[in-house]
Amino acid sequence: MDLNALASARVVDLSLTVSERLPGTWPGHMTYAHHNWNWFAAVEGPTGKTRSAAPYQTNFVVMDEHCGTHFDAPTHFVPPEGSGLPLAGPLGAQAGNRVPLEDLMGPAAVVDVRSLAEGGEPGVSPLIRPDHVRAWEAENGALQEREVVLFRTGWDRYYVEGAEGERYMHGPLVTGESPGWPAPSPETAVYLHERGVKTIGIDAPSIGSAHTPIPVHQEGLGRGMRYVEILTNLGELPVRGAYFVFLPVKISNSSGGPGRAMALLPE
């Protein structure tokens, strides 16, 4: 390992900020909340006097495991073996804290699918099909084992406050008034797995489509793949040449969890 090259690499932050004012929570899941627990001094605030046991600040967070930039472990869609549930199997024991970190990093292959972004109908996602990936390979070379495929949809532009931010998830999923984000079909997940790809990332709310999110999760996670969702800044990466890293919070028996995604670019 060339430590000098590593130390001089440019770091690109691929994580989105989590806030009560931003659309980072899947509709119907636990709402994100961030509140103060202890303040430097007892002062009057909008909800009363702050707690202050000592002169320091600490806050507490309530959030869904799949809020903000996060990853899906197999247990997100694979029930535990012996549960008697459909699709149960050994991967149902691979919780987030048991996913090896090396599975969440590798050379990045950025597949630009922004051209699909305006092709969805209200409440429906345009699908990224195997032929889209094959066309990318014809131009950029075959995908290699352990490469991390990052789908650049451009959907992160809707991760904003206010009415415009409703296009990120609320419009496609709740009201059905706006199109869904581009998302890989189940067949695409299988194709990537057959190419030796372990991890897929996307700069959109989910690897799953707005209209049928479950099958692609069952196909991919059921094969031991890992999905990293709600990324950003994929436009700062070359098609190839960056090294992707996702470092999740190590939560016992989780179905995945939030973390920090980044890419290392050699100078």
What kind of feature is each model-predicted range?
Residues 1-267:
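Active-/binding-site microenvironments in catalytic and ligand-binding cores
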